[in-house]
Amino acid sequence: MAHLKNLPWELIEEILSRVPPKSLVRFRTVSKQWNALFDDKTFINNHKMTFRFILATKSKIYSVSIDPVIVVRELPLGIPGLESLELNNLVDCNELLVCVKNNGAVVWNPWLGQSRWIQPSLNHSPMVFDGIVYDNKKYKMVAFSGLWKIYDFSSDVWIDHKSKSTNSNTNVINVQTAVCLNGNLYWVCFREKTDPLCYHIHKFGFSNSIWVRFCNLPFGRNHDGDALVLGVFRGDRFSLLKQCMVTKKIEVFVTENKINHENGDDVVWKNFMTFSSPNLPDLVETVKFSNPSYFIEGKRLVVCSRDNTGHAWIYILGDSKLISKTRIECVVDPWPLHCTFVPSLVPVPAPCRREEQAELQV
């Protein structure tokens, strides 16, 4: 690759942005500059990788992309922990995917072909895996099993965590609304289920491991059956989707500026999309009351949800109307789990070697 030294760095970045994620891994050893580039948030956001949906049935996992037509691809499952699926949940951790099972979880980067099995704590209570927090390539898993627990990826150890919060009476609506943004976890919380003024976002950070009230929401749920889903917009801000159970009206709000993780007081929400046409689908099925998954692509809203028979659908909305709806026919098993995911270059964190752990303890 000596001839590449004569190319402008901007051109090298453009070339590399078109290389598939799995192929980029081998180029980390070319130079320190290249290795640093693959960890750079701007490069990752500009890389030709777009949002897609991950769907998991009892026997298979699929990637569903929209570029520009819907493409369904079955993902290989020859990795430890996923030989037999039987998943309880899929958790999108921004850069990694967590596949939750009864007896633990698999942290997985499907595009790099890397995975790691996370054994649950010795407590025999079922664990709810909420997501991953990180800082400077150090990672922790946040879970709940009667009390909050923190798993350290480096030491491979679970720690019971005494919950600290600025408002201990705040309840989490749904653990699936947890969102990972730049290393922190955020939840939609409420004081009264059907009081829109009581809804806000709680944050759990890596450094202090404390739950704090972060910012208010522009609206809440008026009915128990309303869809209310927090998401990530443009890689550094929030989005919030709501669908009214009664009118079927869909609203999407986004934050105007990048999220300042130290202070949520300056968060300003604005209406980004509104859909109120009569043919809008029900995004929350009435059988299992599961929230939809969604992402924003340009001026389009792309949603994945299940109908009342358990079949998966992709809805594309834009220009104040429903543009298309497509049933994913090849996903045969009903009631698939689903979440959004962006193919990433982030490796699955490995445990420290014994020598490194000894140095950390010193």
From Swiss-Prot:
<dbReference type="InterPro" id="IPR011047">
    <property type="entry name" value="Quinoprotein_ADH-like_sf"/>
</dbReference>
<dbReference type="InterPro" id="IPR050796">
    <property type="entry name" value="SCF_F-box_component"/>
</dbReference>
<dbReference type="InterPro" id="IPR036047">
    <property type="entry name" value="F-box-like_dom_sf"/>
</dbReference>
<dbReference type="Pfam" id="PF07734">
    <property type="entry name" value="FBA_1"/>
</dbReference>
<dbReference type="InterPro" id="IPR017451">
    <property type="entry name" value="F-box-assoc_interact_dom"/>
</dbReference>
<dbReference type="InterPro" id="IPR006527">
    <property type="entry name" value="F-box-assoc_dom_typ1"/>
</dbReference>
<protein>
    <recommendedName>
        <fullName>F-box protein At2g14710</fullName>
    </recommendedName>
</protein>
<feature type="domain" description="F-box">
    <location>
        <begin position="1"/>
        <end position="47"/>
    </location>
</feature>
<dbReference type="Pfam" id="PF00646">
    <property type="entry name" value="F-box"/>
</dbReference>
<dbReference type="InterPro" id="IPR001810">
    <property type="entry name" value="F-box_dom"/>
</dbReference>
